[in-house]
Curated annotation (Swiss-Prot):
Residues 110-144 have a biased composition (Low complexity). Subunit of the CCR4-NOT core complex. Interacts with pir2. Mg(2+) binds at E387. One of its GO terms (cellular component) is P-body. The gene is ccr4. It is an enzyme of class 3 (hydrolase). Belongs to the CCR4/nocturin family. The lineage of its organism: Eukaryota, Fungi, Dikarya, Ascomycota, Taphrinomycotina. LRR repeats lie at residues 157-180, 182-203, 205-226, 228-249, 251-272. Its cofactor is Mg(2+). This is CCR4-Not complex 3'-5'-exoribonuclease subunit Ccr4. Acts as a catalytic component of the CCR4-NOT core complex, which in the nucleus seems to be a general transcription factor, and in the cytoplasm the major mRNA deadenylase involved in mRNA turnover. Ccr4 has 3'-5' RNase activity with a strong preference for polyadenylated substrates and also low exonuclease activity towards single-stranded DNA. Participates in the shortening of poly(A)-tails. It catalyses: Exonucleolytic cleavage of poly(A) to 5'-AMP. Residues 110-156 are annotated as: Disordered. One of its GO terms (biological process) is nuclear-transcribed mRNA poly(A) tail shortening.
Length: 690
């Protein structure tokens, strides 16, 4: 019976070789580590580990040895038997919940390191024949097919994730093998391979790669794209150089390289600081590749409709050449651009969270200049930034943006209330900037979700969930009330940063529901505020707002919510049911008794466009969690900044990097304020025939 997560790549009809018991296996490893040869004081501990692991690796030279061990154990266990087999060491641990041990003797926090034996599976070659593992193959390659169409593969259950092609004399590996992107462990050790194809970079889920005992001369740089890798064993090959691109393998625990004609610079680094030290050195020393092409601009209306703002063009980086003080036509007075950007707060940008980023590219001194180049280059009329701390707002953003003609508003998160002056300087929050040549501000305010006015409403019951889940979070939103100096049109801008943790989806929904309640109150108040601009200074006729729903509203920021989430559904549809799954069966009084709704006709600027597939790009997550929402009855989106070039992304594991200063990318949209249409006069033609 074969392992359901593990296949040897063949059907082996013969008797399986004997296997070591766990005690004998561990004893064999310890005997190598404690051998007199390794007690030489001139050998570093890191290199002793290399020698010990290389010796262990050489014991796995038989055809499909790891798969045979797993299959033999499964057969001996009988029906229903389940036991964990560690393919790296050949050892077994009893019980279905035992964790797989790495060759380092530690544990990986991933299910892929443990193989549970319950059912059988087979894998045929593309020719439809079965390889006989009793003799070594001499074919030029072994091609492996999925045996399923793309439509069927989506429904196919993957009962194995490990593949053992070790010790069978392979000379080449077919690129079809790398279509198995679900693989977590690949063993191609002790063959006759001379190269690893660059297509290996497609195995994004690979945790362990063993290509020891071959004649490989070079490591493909594409291996650096496999950020899930914990072990790469390349013992006994012909490798002399380790490509700097492997510096992105921030989770790599062991790079087995003993038995290679390695250049001294790499060998010395491993001897001194081990795999972690080598990877860090490679990461910081990796040459910076060419920058990506400029992000394009998507026009959503025709040129005949005067769609392009003086400050927006299809060559978006040319925005700095635009004259922001240039007189505008009447229709262009109604146009403006807005940016939303989570800039990644200085204290959040740590090597622990962003281990794939060079330390110099992670430093605030480097990133802040890139951020400011983006802000100046895109030249938006309104800019909403998240994760801006007090210190950098006061000393960097506010002064720099003032020189560019902006005025700013900043509020830190609620925790600042409990801190002294030194501590509060590093608390981040939301900052909104607007061009003083175009807007005047009526009012600014902050919504603190742990003490929002919505919590004091009589119909809101403060349940234990509200106290323990919502009011313990210190997220905020910043609202600014703006008036256009040229036409008197009003605009409400909400700059939001919603809670991040997916385990608190309910909190996200509650926060956004509170936000919409507050915006309704603010819009009602703003509608009745007197204008700050005398009528004789206006170039256009001042608009009127007979009801608060007529005022243009923009809600921008990092919502930490993708399309289809409760937050997205609530904003786009105008309501959320009391039993929505994102409430997570928690009691929030009125929210979970009758659901919640808002009266605004909100649309996502990027919602119906294919211009942007993600706003957050890291090895563990790629998705659109930042949004620009607008009131469709009063605003029309006329243009959008497109996403990052796909060819560039194919060689990037995540942001930030040398070209992108945050793990988020900025959103930029152009809007046009809709004008109330004057009713057509009634027809004076007399169609009555008498």
């Amino acid at each position: 019976m074969f392992n359901p997560r593990y296949t040897q790549g063949t059907i082996y009809p013969g008797a399986h070789p004997g296997l070591l018991t766990p005690d004998h296996q561990h004893a064999a490893i310890l005997s190598v580590q404690n051998s007199p040869a390794l007690e030489n004081s001139n050998i570093s501990e890191h290199w002793k580990q290399q020698i010990a692991l290389a010796t262990q690796s050489r014991s796995f030279s038989s055809p499909h040895q790891r798969a045979h061990n797993a299959a033999a154990l499964a057969r001996s266990g009988g029906p229903g038997f389940s036991m964990n087999y560690n393919a790296r060491t050949g050892a077994f641990t009893g019980g279905p919940n035992a964790a797989g041990l790495s060759s380092l003797g530690g544990k990986y926090n991933t299910s892929s390191t443990t193989t549970t034996l319950t059912t059988s599976t087979t894998l045929n070659t593309s020719s439809g024949t079965t390889l006989n593992s009793t003799s070594k193959t001499t074919t030029s390659s072994v091609a492996v097919d999925d045996q399923k169409s793309k439509s069927d593969s989506k429904k196919e259950r993957r009962d194995w994730t490990c593949l053992d092609l070790g010790g069978i004399g392979l000379r080449n590996v077919s690129t079809d093998l790398f279509k198995f992107s679900f693989l977590t462990e690949l063993y191609i050790n002790h063959n006759n391979l001379t190269r690893l194809p660059p297509e290996i970079g497609k195995l994004k889920n690979l945790v362990i790669l063993d290509a020891s005992g071959n004649s490989i001369k070079t490591i493909p740089p594409e291996l650096g794209l496999l950020t899930e890798l914990r072990e790469v064993l390349l013992f006994d090959n012909m490798i002399s150089v380790i490509p700097a691109e492997l510096g992105t393998l921030f989770q790599l625990k062991i790079l087995g390289i003993e038995g290679n004609p390695l250049q001294d610079v790499y060998k010395n680094q491993i001897m001194e600081s081990g795999t972690a030290g080598l990877i860090a050195a490679l990461r910081d020393g990796c040459p910076v590749g060419p920058p990506p092409p400029e992000r394009g601009w998507e026009k959503l209306v025709s040129d005949d409709d005067d769609d392009v703002n003086d400050n927006v063009s299809t060559s978006v980086r040319d925005l700095t050449a635009a004259d922001s003080n240039k007189p505008s036509t009447t229709s262009k007075n109604l146009k403006f651009t807005i940016m939303s950007y989570n800039v990644l707060c200085e204290r959040y940008a740590t090597s622990t969270l962003y281990g794939y980023t060079p330390s110099w590219a992670l430093s605030w001194s480097y990133r802040k200049d890139l951020i400011m180049q983006e802000l100046g280059g895109y030249n938006a009329d309104i800019i909403c930034l998240q994760e801006v701390d007090v210190e950098n707002y006061d000393t960097f953003f506010a002064p720099q943006m003032s020189l560019k003609g902006y005025k700013g508003v900043h509020f830190p998160k609620s925790r600042v209330r409990t801190m002294n002056e030194v501590e509060r300087r590093i608390v981040d929050g939301c900052a909104t900037f607007f061009k003083t040549s175009k807007y005047v501000m009526h009012e600014k305010m902050v919504i603190e979700y742990n003490q929002a006015p919505s919590l004091r409403r009589q119909d809101i019951k403060l349940t234990s969930n509200m106290y323990n889940r919502v009011m313990t979070k210190d997220n905020i939103s910043v609202i600014t009330l703006l008036e256009n100096k040229e036409n008197g049109s009003r605009l409400i801008v909400a700059n939001c940063h919603i809670h991040w943790d997916p385990q608190f989806r309910d909190v996200k929904v509650i926060q956004v529901a509170m936000l919409m309640d507050e915006i309704a109150q603010v819009a009602t108040k703003f509608r009745n505020m007197p204008s700050k601009i005398p009528s004789d200074q206006l170039k256009d006729e001042r608009p009127t707002y007979p009801e608060y729903l007529k005022i243009p509203i923009l809600i921008c920021g990092d919502f930490n919510s993708v399309q289809g989430s409760g937050v997205y559904d609530f904003l786009s549809s105008g309501s959320i049911s009391q039993n929505h799954e994102d409430f997570m069966n928690n009691d929030y009084g009125e929210y979970t008794v009758n659901g919640r709704s808002h009266a605004f006709n909100l649309k996502s600027a990027y919602g119906e466009s294919e211009a942007l597939s993600f706003t957050n790009y890291t090895p563990g997550f790629k998705g659109a969690i930042d949004h620009i929402w607008y009131t469709g009855n009063s605003l029309e989106v006329t243009g959008l900044l497109k996403g990052v070039d796909k060819d560039y992304l194919s060689g990037v594991v995540g942001f930030p990097n040398a070209h992108f200063p945050s793990d988020h990318i900025c959103l930029l949209a152009e809007f046009k304020v809709k004008q109330e249409k004057t009713p057509l006069p009634s027809s004076k033609f007399n169609n009555d025939k008498k």
